[in-house]
C-alpha cells in the first residue's frame, strides 16, 4: 500500500490522471494518508495545470465512497 501511495503521489505531479488513478489518489487523500505538504503539492499541481474531466470524476467517486449517508424521515424539497 505504501509503495502504491508513493507512486500515485509522484504520478499526480507529473501528468494528468485517469479516472481510476484519480480515484485512487483521492481515496488516499480522504483517508488522510498524505502530509499537509504533500497534499498541498498535489492539489496545487492539479489546479495549476487545470483539472481534467477524468480527474474530477475520479475525485467525485472517491468522495462519494468516503461520505456519510444521512437518513431522514423529513421530506426535503
Residues covered by each model-derived region:
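Acidic, glycine/proline-rich low-complexity segments that act as flexible tails and inter-domain linkers
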Residues: 1-77
